[in-house]
Amino acid sequence: MSKQPSPHKMIRDSSEFIHFEDRASDHPFVEKVWRCHSDRADKFLSVAANSFEMALTRLAGRTFLTLRGPETSSTLMDCPAEGEWVCIRFKPGTFMRGFLPGGLRDHHDVTLPPASGRSFWLKGSALDYPSFDNAETFVKHLVKSGIVTRDPIVEDTLLRSPRNLSLRSAQRHFLQSTGVTYATFRQIERARYATILLREEVSILDVVSRLGIFRPGPPHAIP
């Protein structure tokens, strides 16, 4: 089965057959909002990613919303022709109750049941599909309803200012709320940054230097 593309994961020249744009968000739980459409069917490389996402798909007369978790490795995927997508990418540590990122990891996506052409079922209620322009309003409703939440310990850990927790407790919080370990999270971030640099034709030696690939991590890093 082909997987619909997540725009921020495109690493080939998307101008060939996929056109997309993104924007920043002022919502504290949202990292970015994306949308794209495809002119024809082709393949794309879905690179490793740490994010939890909600992706709205319009394809062949159908509309549906899919929940996606982190991807720990890159995968060559099929992109269908004449599809449209809107994607909400959440900040690390944000998750939906009942659909933890670990359960969605590595293409174990969950498509929520449609209620109509404009809405879907979630927790017994029919909700309108989000759009590129009203994504924040959609997320605010989910947060207010207690459906989407965020673990502040994840942000503290990434900022290297963990709360008064044992190492084991911090590790448990991080894994549960992101779906990956801290070490895996950092590896994925470095790989994604390296991909961006290589696309910008930065030399391999400069990429290695910028990423500090051979530099040992600090002794207090969470494994």
Where do the protein language model's features map onto the residues?
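Alpha-helical bundle regulatory/interaction domains
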Residues: 1-167, 177-182, 196-217
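Short hydrophobic/aromatic patch on the recognition helix
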Residues: 170, 218-222
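Short, basic, alpha-helical segments at the C-terminal edge of helix-turn-helix-like DNA-binding modules
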Residues: 186-196
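A generic alpha-helix surface/boundary motif
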Residues: 168-169, 189
